[in-house]
Regions:
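Extracytoplasmic/periplasmic substrate-recognition and gating elements
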Residues: 5, 132-198
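Short, small-residue-biased leader/transition segments that mark boundaries at the very start
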Residues: 1-2
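Extracytoplasmic/periplasmic solute-binding protein
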Residues: 16-71, 117
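Short helix-initiation/N-cap motifs at beta->coil->alpha
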Residues: 13-17, 99-114
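Alpha-to-beta junction loops
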Residues: 32, 114-122, 136
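Glycine-centered hinge/linker elements that transmit conformational signals in sensory
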Residues: 21-23, 67-102
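Short, solvent-exposed loop/beta-turn-alpha elements that line the ligand-binding surface or hinge
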Residues: 41-44, 59-84, 132, 145-155, ...
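Conserved C-terminal helix/tail region of periplasmic/extracytoplasmic solute-binding proteins
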Residues: 27, 225-283
Length: 283
């Protein structure tokens, strides 16, 4: 769609580039017939995209700057960047920002697949929801927030879950479990089960990983092969679900009334809420 506007994906390598394209779309949306972003819905089916996945960016860059991988006291170093990308989303979308509290994930999918918007924040797992638009009409960009060195930034990549082996199980069961896990990622049958569309469609970080039938996965792999630095998921370091929920509530309040006072609520939820929830988790 942005090709119709005279842009290509190569025109966007930073937040400044993204902002330029997005605001041009908004300026010409009546002429073009579409908006820049799908609605940033903040109901329970959609808010995780912003209180968790989008919030990952300022956390990741703070960790990188400070040389850490976890903290009990986040500083909010990149909260201005978080505000900038959130402002861009909510002020250049398909609906008035005051309506976002009731907008859903399904609304965003519908807006994207019916070509009401150019950009839709989600991951490779959402391919099934948007495949009808056609693979040739799909691409992926990093989430740029104006952080230093982001021209070398790749896609956000990670996992929230892990396979664990119970140390209290019998030695035989532990070995059988390890053998099975090894079989899953090394054998032909196991990797087909793990990676193929007929199986679970996973991407596995092993040599036997199969080329995915999901084009979004292959785009993500291309970024890594070209030397772009993937953004780690920091979700497991977020102190609690309550922290996410409080942050989401503050983002929703701010979207409806974009004042500095309401952004202060976001800062408080992000920084003070982190310290509070981290302390509670250690009691």
């Amino acid at each position: 769609m942005y090709k119709r506007q005279g842009y290509t994906q190569d025109d966007i390598k930073s937040f400044a580039d993204l902002k330029k394209v997005v605001e041009d779309i908004t300026k010409r949306k009546d002429e073009l017939g579409f908006s820049a972003f799908t609605s940033a819905g903040m109901d329970g089916s959609s808010d995780w995209r912003f209180k968790t996945h989008l919030a990952n960016l300022p956390i990741y860059y703070e960790y990188q700057k400070d040389g850490i991988t976890d903290t009990k006291a986040i500083k909010g170093t990149y909260l201005d960047n978080y505000r900038n990308i959130w402002d861009l989303y909510i002020n250049n979308g398909t609906c008035d920002a005051k309506q976002l509290s009731k907008k859903t994930g399904d609304d965003a999918v519908a807006e994207f697949t019916t070509e009401q918007a150019v950009f839709y924040q989600n991951g490779t797992w959402a391919y099934g929801d948007i495949a009808d638009i056609g693979d040739d009409n799909l691409g992926m960009l990093p989430i740029y927030i104006g952080a230093p060195g982001e021209e070398k930034q790749g896609l956000c990549t990670g996992t929230e879950n892990y396979w664990c082996v119970n140390k209290n199980a019998s030695k035989e069961d532990i070995q059988a479990t390890l053998d099975f896990m090894n079989w899953c990622v090394t054998s032909e049958e196991g990797t087909k089960m793990m990676c193929s569309a007929d199986g679970m469609g996973f991407v596995i970080p092993f040599k036997n990983n199969l080329k995915s039938e999901n084009p979004l996965v292959n785009i993500a792999n291309d970024y890594m092969e070209k030397g772009y630095t993937p953004v780690d998921w920091t979700f497991s370091t977020m102190p609690s679900e309550q922290w996410k929920n409080d942050l989401g509530s503050a983002l929703t309040t701010y979207a409806a009334d974009q004042t500095d006072a309401n952004w202060k609520l976001v800062q408080t939820a992000f920084v003070d809420g982190w310290a509070k929830e981290a302390a509670a988790a250690t009691k």
